Curated annotation (Swiss-Prot):
Location(s) in or outside the cell: Cytoplasm
Disulfide bridge map: none
EC number in record: 3.1.-.-
GO molecular-function term, one example from the UniProt record: nuclease activity
The protein's name: Putative pre-16S rRNA nuclease
Keyword terms of this UniProt record: Cytoplasm, Hydrolase, Nuclease, Ribosome biogenesis
Function, as annotated: Could be a nuclease involved in processing of the 5'-end of pre-16S rRNA.
Length: 145
């Protein structure tokens, strides 16, 4: 079962897709969105579902360090609800605390990437980390429709 991992922000959504066996995650792209104008990039998500034969979603849930849910986590949950309503595919959530920090560290230490280039790929890499963490923990989508 191929899964799509999503790192949802207020201006971008990082997208990653798993392999068919659910072992590895690969960053795919960054979709520009605008929450204020209710432009959530769902048409592009639909195109990616079709082209990658995706059968479920893992959405990053940015919990606070004390495990509570703040405004960004609530926005991610709403995005998950929109995915369910639009595509009728199962959605699960993965704690994404510090994945963007980890992604930035990887880009600096391992790829020696400039700040400008990091901004262009960080959300895609974070989505890959969210999905890979989920796959490592669960192996497949654990929440059904």
């Amino acid at each position: 079962m191929k899964l799509m991992g999503l790192d949802v922000g207020s201006r971008t959504v990082g997208v990653a897709v798993s392999d068919a066996l659910g072992w590895t995650a690969q960053g795919v792209e960054i979709i520009r969105i605008n929450e204020d104008e209710e432009q959530f990039g769902l048409d592009r998500v639909g195109e990616l579902i079709a082209s990658h034969d995706v059968q479920g979603f893992v959405v990053g849930l940015p919990k606070n360090m004390n495990n509570s849910l703040g405004p960004r986590a609530e926005a991610s949950k709403r995005y998950g609800d929109m995915l369910t309503a639009r595509f009728n595919l199962p959605v699960d959530f993965e704690d994404e605390r510090l994945t963007t920090v980890e992604a930035e560290r990887m880009l600096v230490e391992q790829a020696d990437t400039s700040r400008r280039k990091r901004k262009q790929v960080i959300d895609k890499l974070a989505a890959g980390l969210i999905l890979q963490n989920y796959l490592d923990r669960h192996g497949k989508l654990t929440r059904e429709k």
